[in-house]
Amino acid sequence: MLMNFGGSYDAYINNFQGTFLAEWMLDHPSVPYIAGVMYLILVLYVPKSIMASQPPLNLRAANIVWNLFLTLFSMCGAYYTVPYLVKAFMNPEIVMAASGIKLDANTSPIITHSGFYTTTCALADSFYFNGDVGFWVALFALSKIPEMIDTAFLVFQKKPVIFLHWYHHLTVMLFCWFAYVQKISSGLWFASMNYSVHSIMYLYYFVCACGHRRLVRPFAPIITFVQIFQMVVGTIVVCYTYTVKHVLGRSCTVTDFSLHTGLVMYVSYLLLFSQLFYRSYLSPRDKASIPHVAAEIKKKE
């Protein structure tokens, strides 16, 4: 049975066509908005109304299962996307040949013939949108809606939901939905980074949920630092693609929507995470009042 499942799974993801999913998402733009409204109700209304007079629910078992699932899910996503990103980065000629992009012979090779250019600007459906990598990039875009269940655990256990937590969940969910529909080339960077960071982050949450918080607590600032580094790289990717497309006027498969919203998101995340890191681990005044909150928040990329 396992062999049959494995064979069916391999056959499905190897023949996956992201275009069909993108068309469905394009035809259903109300889905992320409805999810967003319901999420805001969960964050802003439920704690002050439904849960105000209720005791916190004991969701430890469910929380353990949930974090274990997201850990394994993120590891699988990283397993498929990260090696492919590295391969495309180290062998840009393969991506350029498949993309069909015609380059000006006088253009600096540092700008438009490098691995960074090919992995951020030279989209080829056969590389990023279809097949096994395309399948996990698609799951990345879709997973941002169910990942908001993170917040439900906090709300129904009557734990605080800080602004960074729900702001990040909400904006990433909306961005991923519409950026996927627009087939932005830099999406592989975002998916690879997010899967990688989440593999570590949800593993931390899983161990904490199992009752071993003290064991992994020293890793909390490291996790937050890695998240900050993710935001730095994301900001660099967005700024680079903007420069290539609008300053140099070269071909780059990104949209103005993804450039503008991506820049606002990554810069705001960078500022908020940096502030959180400082208040949690560097500021003597706030260390006691915000104990290890940086790695406790259910956030992400």
From Swiss-Prot:
GO CC annotation, single: endoplasmic reticulum
Known catalytic reactions: an acyl-CoA + malonyl-CoA + H(+) = a 3-oxoacyl-CoA + CO2 + CoA
Location of this chain's protein in the cell: Endoplasmic reticulum membrane
Membrane topology: Multi-pass membrane protein
Source taxon at top rank: Eukaryota
EC number from the UniProt entry: 2.3.1.-
Enzyme class per UniProt: transferase
Keyword Transmembrane helix: yes
Effect of loss of the gene: Genetic disruption in bloodstream form parasites reduces fatty acid synthesis from C14- and C16-CoA primers. RNAi-mediated knockdown in tsetse fly procyclic form parasites results in reduced fatty acid synthesis.
Region forming the signal peptide: none
GO MF term (any one): fatty acid elongase activity
Predominant localisation class: endoplasmic reticulum
Residue spans crossing the bilayer: 31-51, 64-84, 122-142, 161-181, 187-207, 219-239, 257-277
BP-aspect Gene Ontology terms: fatty acid elongation; fatty acid elongation, monounsaturated fatty acid; fatty acid elongation, polyunsaturated fatty acid; fatty acid elongation, saturated fatty acid; long-chain fatty acid biosynthetic process; sphingolipid biosynthetic process; very long-chain fatty acid biosynthetic process
UniProt KW Nucleotide-binding keyword: no
Active-site residue numbers: 168
This protein's UniProt keywords: Endoplasmic reticulum, Fatty acid biosynthesis, Fatty acid metabolism, Lipid biosynthesis, Lipid metabolism, Membrane, Transferase, Transmembrane, Transmembrane helix
UniProt motif (HxxHH motif) ranges: 165-169
Known pathway: Lipid metabolism; fatty acid biosynthesis
UniProt family annotation: Belongs to the ELO family.
Function: Involved in the synthesis of fatty acids. Elongates C14 fatty acids to C18.
Descriptive protein name: Fatty acid elongase 3
Species name: Trypanosoma brucei brucei (strain 927/4 GUTat10.1)
UniProt lineage: Eukaryota, Discoba, Euglenozoa, Kinetoplastea, Metakinetoplastina
Designated gene of the protein: ELO3
